[in-house]
Every structure is written in structure tokens, then in C-alpha cells.
Amino acid sequence: MEKRVFLIVLDSFGIGAEPDAAAFGDEGTNTLGAIAGHPNFNCPNLKKLGLFNIDGVTAGEKTDAPAGAFARLQEQSMGKDTTIGHWEIAGVVSPNPLPTFPNGFPEELIQEFEAKTGHKVLCNLPYSGTEVLKDYGEQAMKENALIVYTSADSVFQVAAHEELVPVPELYRYCEIAREMLKGAYGVGRVIARPFLGSSAETFYRTTNRHDLSLKPPRATMLDLLKEAGRDVIAVGKIFDIFDGQGVTEKIKTTGNTNGIAFTKALQTRDFEGLAFVNL
């Protein structure tokens, strides 16, 4: 068996707010603390590795002899979204945050997007991805419109009903948006959010999500490994987050269970290098 590393990121799984959380409107956030009280919460393997032994973690029970090394890390980059975080893991610290749009995107930008896609745009506000379908999904179906929304992160998200806007067409619209969103409007990710269903109560997001990211501003750990002749296997969103830069093989997943299955399958493969997994 060759030398290899499995680097698995539990995306958005935090253990408490950082000192600068107020700058991002995230005071008091703690994903682990929020879910640990649920009756179905159970993570024996993470417990064995030392999750509950990490400094500052008050949820769960510590283990006397952790099987893994553990630490509490603080991000150095000025930003908190998926793109910035993964880039830092790979060695790129970002001195400036990617732009966010708490009041929606400028009207002239939306009008240009409408003209280039031939579809009316609805919403154009920060929104929950599930709530936006409840509030705008039926109108989008009636008008064959696109739902554009953002969040606290640097994202431009485009939702469309798969039966009205085929998935490849939605991907093309997102490529149009990616070309438009540069400079001051250069969001970290443009995200295609296809959905299905027939009413506000039945709409659901499908597994055909697709992210279009900015390229990292310089070489990352992935590039160095690739240049050294090592394998860099991207599982889940990793390929999209790095816009393919430094990746030698990509594995698309349809969710966390699927992602874990692919990761377990990789454990039986001979390769030398990195398996970078996003769950």
C-alpha cells in the first residue's frame, strides 16, 4: 500500500464561535452544541477519536484514551465561507473576504442576467434554500422564472424547476453568471440549485447541485501534490471548490451517505497521495 492521506471535511460542522464572529453576524454559533441535545445524536467513532476532548467543547462525554490527535483551530483568513475555508486548509490564507450581498445583488446585474438567460428573476435576497422554494417556487413555475438568492456567504444561487429548466440548461445559466460575477461582484461560488415538486408543500432540492467557484489566487497543496506526481482525488464538492485546480480525479457524490461510501471504497484502492473529501 502506498503512502496516502484521507482529508475529510465535515462542511459547516463547527464547535463554537471564533473571536471575530461578531464581524460576520455569527455570535454564539455552535453547530455541535446545537445538535448534541437531540435524542438521535450519536457519534461513537468521533468520540473515540477525541471530539469531546477538544478544548472548549462542553457537549458529550470525554474519553479517557482518545484514539486520535485533536485540536481546536482558528481560521486566519478574513472570511468564513466554504471557499475561503477550504483554500486555507490547502495553504492559501485570504487577507480579504469575498464579497457578500446582504441586500441582494445590484439591479443592473440582475437585469443583465435576465437578458442573457431569457428568464425573469425572482427573489434576489438572502434566503434559506428551502424557504425560498416555499415562497417563490410556485411563481417560478407559473412564469418559467429563475429564483436567484444569496446567503451570509459569498454565493449567487440559482434555483429552477427541473421540468421547466433542464439541468444542463441551468448549468449553462450558472456559467453565464460566473462570467458576469467578477471584480467587485466576484462571489466565491455560483451554485445551481435544481428542484422538483408541484407545490410549496412538496418542493424539494434534487441532488443535481453544481458549484462554480473562483480559482484559487495561487498554487495550493493540491497543485504541489499533483506536480510531484501524486494522486489528488476530489470527493464531493472539492473539485468545484478549487475549480478543478490541482485535482487528478474527481468523484461526484449525491449526498453524505454516498460520499462516505465512495471514501470507504477508496480505502481499498492502491494510490499514492491525497483523497480530499467534502461531506
Predicted regions, residues:
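Anion-binding catalytic surfaces of enzymes that hydrolyze or transfer phosphate/sulfate esters
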Residues: 142-150, 154-155, 181-279
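Beta-strand elements within well-structured catalytic alpha/beta cores of enzymes
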Residues: 2-16, 89, 225, 273-279
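Active-site glycine-rich loop that binds ribose-phosphate moieties when present
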Residues: 127-132, 168-176, 213-216
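Glycine-rich, charged/polar anion/phosphate-binding loops
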Residues: 71-75, 132-134, 176, 216-219, ...
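Amphipathic alpha-helical segments that form well-ordered structural scaffolds
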Residues: 112, 173-176, 220-227
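Active-site nucleophile/metal-coordination loop of metallo-enzymes that catalyze phosphate/sulfate
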Residues: 12-161, 165-168, 193, 201
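A generic local secondary-structure boundary/capping motif
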Residues: 77-79, 135-138, 177-181, 221-223
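Charged, low-complexity intrinsically disordered tails and linkers
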Residues: 157-187
